[in-house]
Amino acid sequence: MPCRREEEEEAGEEAEGEEEEEDSFLLLQQSVALGSSGEVDRLVAQIGETLQLDAAQHSPASPCGPPGAPLRAPGPLAAAVPADKARSPAVPLLLPPALAETVGPAPPGVLRCALGDRGRVRGRAAPYCVAELATGPSALSPLPPQADLDGPPGAGKQGIPQPLSGPCRRGWLRGAAASRRLQQRRGSQPETRTGDDDPHRLLQQLVLSGNLIKEAVRRLHSRRLQLRAKLPQRPLLGPLSAPVHEPPSPRSPRAACSDPGASGRAQLRTGDGVLVPGS
């Protein structure tokens, strides 16, 4: 008995494989007779669906398909499916409000990306607007109205970006929080600087005008002059030279000591102004 069951199962699998091969053969055979561009596009979409279904059948566990629902290849009547129904799996996630209501909820894990929306003005914290869609009927929510296209050009810049979850925005959020804290600290301090004393603005002006190196040299020179003014003034010492020996004068005591004959002729002046002959 078990042998008969195994043979029946193998025969059933072979029959299903033959049906799939026949379906694929019919689909490819019909593609030869097509001529218009609309039919070619429709056939390309059907071939893509067939390849996706075949890949899902051969894989052990398909994460895209619902559990327990077997996938079947399209039959010979699949060529008569209209183009709008054949391309239903490839509907973009970002739809206008009229079409977003007709589409069912998206599976969990689908990412929404607004990279193609170049007209929107976004802040520094959310440049890409990538978020994971939530499950439910409100998963495919339409885009918010663009204020920069309808209103004045500067109206959209003041809008705060919507909080979107995602690991790719953590760095941007940290940078935005740090810049916000820095702005709050600057706002709490009294504004003692004017617009001309702002170092960032002055640096930008110097870079644009090309006078950055000149300004740096001028500041270094002025700082050197300030340091020289703060130092005490000291007389400059001349160059060192050998001492010059001058001949001693005859009236000096050194000359008297050096010349014993002149010591008798030397006269000393006392405090009273009386000249006393030297001994």
Curated annotation (Swiss-Prot):
Modifications the protein undergoes after translation, according to the UniProt entry: Phosphorylated.
GO cellular component entries: cytoplasm; cytosol; intracellular membrane-bounded organelle; nucleus
GO molecular function: molecular function inhibitor activity
Spans traversing the lipid bilayer: none
Region span, Disordered: 1-24, 56-76, 136-200, 228-279
InterPro entries per UniProt: GSK3-bd
Stretch list, region Involved in GSK-3 binding: 198-220
One GO term of the biological process aspect: regulation of protein export from nucleus
UniProt keyword annotations, A-Z: Cytoplasm, Phosphoprotein, Proto-oncogene, Wnt signaling pathway
UniProt-annotated location(s): Cytoplasm
Keyword Signal: no
Residues recorded with modification Phosphoserine: S88, S249, S252
Acidic residues compositional bias, start-end: 7-24
PANTHER family according to UniProt: GBP PROTEIN, PROTO-ONCOGENE FRAT1
Biological role: Positively regulates the Wnt signaling pathway by stabilizing beta-catenin through the association with GSK-3. May play a role in tumor progression and collaborate with PIM1 and MYC in lymphomagenesis.
Quaternary structure note: Binds DVL1. Binds GSK-3 and prevent GSK-3-dependent phosphorylation.
Family according to the record: Belongs to the GSK-3-binding protein family.
Protein name: Proto-oncogene FRAT1
Source organism phylogeny: Eukaryota, Metazoa, Chordata, Craniata, Vertebrata
Gene it is expressed from: FRAT1
